Amino acid sequence: EQNRGNGYIWHTTGSGKTLTSFKASTLLKDNRNIAKCLFVVDRKDLDRQTREEFNKFQEGCVEENTNTETLVKRLVSEDYRDKVIVTTIQKLGLALDDDNKRSKEKKKKGELTYKERLAPLKDSRIAIIFDECHRSQFGENHKAIKNFFPKAQLFGFTGTPIFEENATYKQIDGTIGCYTTTKDIFEKELHAYTITHAIDDRNVLRFHIDYFKPENDRDASRTV
């Protein structure tokens, strides 16, 4: 509604994140102010799984991007069918990297690199939805995406957001500092439906935890 800012949605596993993200993608697809809607996953198997799920909800909704070349063609395409694109963060990162081997080979041949071909999209309004945004959204690929698409709005879906208390800590210039949190990347929490909510609503099964502390290492190895 506000046409600005980023945000993340904290929905627990099994609560229907894929269906929610599909509905968000279809609404964005029909928004004339949005040039593209990218749904970005962090693994190849999730790429296939998401496409299959989206196409179950609406047949022919998204096509397979077999490689980076296909991804780039769909990104620059003005075909309405190519407005929603499901891809991996690795493929998108590769398309925006001018220093990789493939880009250097294209330069030698006098061909445009993937990044150069995507230049017309640089200042376009693009919505980028990151699945499982607690995982690989803090690396170089994510930085490259944000730098190349400065006007993009970023939305993240996660069942386990990274907060300061569960972030990984490291030494930074001799002082202790934590890695980036989900809020640092995606700013505002748009909605939360946690495991507690899901259990209370009986949408997921309750679970019981037992703690066992062996008396010594020998007992531990025997138990394992």
Predicted stretch roles:
Residues 69-85, 99-103, 120:
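Conserved motor-coupling elements within RecA-like helicase/translocase cores
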Residues 3-24:
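Walker A/P-loop
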Residues 12-13, 132-136, 148-167, 202:
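Conserved helicase ATPase motor motifs in RecA-like P-loop NTPase domains
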Residues 18-20, 33-56:
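Conserved Walker A/P-loop ATP-binding site and its immediately adjacent core
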Residues 104-110, 114-155:
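SF2 helicase catalytic motif II
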Residues 2-8, 35, 82-83:
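Pre-Walker A (Motif I) flank of P-loop NTPase domains
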Residues 167-224:
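Interdomain helical connector at the RecA1-RecA2 junction of SF1/SF2 helicase-like NTPases
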Residues 8, 36-38, 51, 57-72:
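Conserved RecA-like helicase motor-core motifs
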